[in-house]
């Protein structure tokens, strides 16, 4: 899809939340023509070995699923459309992929707009610190004090939308020939 879009457009930016942010970063690592990234609470560092070991032990014990992790949202009444269960083998596969993402962060050279929730119960905010330290392109971080992980449905959703539009408009306008 990126290849088709890049063939038709002067510049392409990629936006993602959580695992979508991980995938956006991965794409920028592998496709240097990505003009910009805007990511919200991306997972770019795998969890510690205790966490992965616990999941592996659950699988070895016969468990294939765990309760879902959706709707980490501070705003009362806001609900994320998420799976009610978490497939454990898929989680381990995600963590393996994130190891690759972390290893190649220094290959990201495009401008990055990074939104980080300080009270994220899904992705450790330290993941954002690693991204800021390792990417080679300029990073603008927006700290979200009131929103949890799914910040695009939380208190700061309007700020995320406005800042993303402003950032991408500037970067993509500058990227036009």
Cite the ranges covered by each PLM segment.
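Short beta-strand/loop motif that positions the catalytic acidic residue
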Residues: 107-108, 114-116, 120
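Short alpha-helix in the alpha/beta-hydrolase fold that links the catalytic acid
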Residues: 110, 124-133
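Catalytic active-site module of serine/aspartate enzymes centered on a nucleophile-bearing elbow/loop
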Residues: 146-177
